[in-house]
């Protein structure tokens, strides 16, 4: 098993010297990176990549035997269908196994139920392209309770088996839940 580097936190280092950055993480034993990808919004100033940034990075990633197995994606919360084709193409072209989303901004039961419907639909579309969908937790969706569960647990259960979890144990701990007990 190899560990990966979540690129959001090291975006400055990546921008300053991509090759030097990859040399360092390779020497440290990392073999994967996990970029944050904005599909229709250019937020590169905030550490996000666009699909063309991923394409440009691939030759350098291949040179250092670094894979992109998962990508955090930031989509229009109510119009995922516009991104289906783009995500399917990325999955097939770069062998991305997982696309990672987060909980909605508003963590009320009705919003979580609506989001679960959209996430199931997105997961079904990604499955056709050979990829899956994971939900990444943050502090807020651990702190807020819905029907006696964390909002994160509620959303995962509402999504069903087609959608998995990418548990951020740091945020879980900050939210007051023991990650070991949760897992």
Give the location of each predicted region:
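A short alpha/beta connector and helix-capping loop motif
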Residues: 176-183
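N-terminal pre-domain/capping segments
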Residues: 1-93, 97
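Conserved Rossmann-like nucleotide-binding pocket used by diverse enzymes
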Residues: 4-6, 134, 166
